[in-house]
Design a protein with these regions (language model features):
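N-terminal targeting leaders
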Residues: 2-181
Length: 181
């Protein structure tokens, strides 16, 4: 009987330990989209869009505003809810009455940034790094071999003229997106 009790207790302990080991914790960031949207609306910034990638920990602002101060205010509002998440501020400043001209200038500037970024990435031997440029914000994607190459890609992109922000979504085991303003 004693060996049966020991066996039963051992089996229960093993089952509990196994179940405890199976518990998972979510690495997703908190959903802040509705809170940011509500605060932007209250601030009169209704033309600003909000999206979030909870897996990567990135909150992205888009759309257009008439002044730099509005763009800065939108970023501050988003950051107040985002916590440790990166806020990618892709808002275009488009002056009222000159929307088409402003959009053309922004598109031309983004194209110039892409060209300069192509050259910079080749010089840094980072040809495999993928990126997108939207309203002077560079988003790096893909994979790199080391944390050093991840950092090199970020600093290389940040050094390109007219880049306002770099969102680094490059994957290196165990790391999340970062931002460099």
């Amino acid at each position: 009987m004693t060996s049966f009790k020991v066996f039963t207790i051992s089996a229960v302990a093993l089952a509990v330990a196994g179940l405890t080991g199976c518990s998972t914790t979510s690495t997703k960031a908190a959903d802040v989209t509705a809170s940011v949207r509500n605060s932007l609306d209250q601030a009169g910034l209704k033309d600003v869009s909000v999206s979030q990638d909870r897996d990567k920990g990135v909150v992205t602002l888009g759309g257009h505003v008439p002044a730099d101060a509005d763009k800065t205010q939108a970023a501050s509002i988003a950051q107040s809810f985002a916590g440790t998440q990166v806020v990618a501020n892709e808002i275009a400043v488009v002056m009222t009455g000159a929307e088409s001209d402003s959009k053309k200038v922004n598109a031309a500037l983004d194209k110039a940034i892409e060209g300069n970024l192509d050259v910079a990435m080749v010089k840094a031997k980072l040809r495999d790094v993928k990126y997108a440029v939207n309203n002077h914000v560079v988003t790096l994607t893909g994979t790199v071999n080391s944390p050093a190459n991840r950092k090199l890609a970020e600093t290389t992109a940040a050094a390109v003229a007219d880049v306002q922000q770099v969102v680094n979504e490059l994957q290196v085991k165990g790391q999340k997106a970062t931002s460099m303003n």
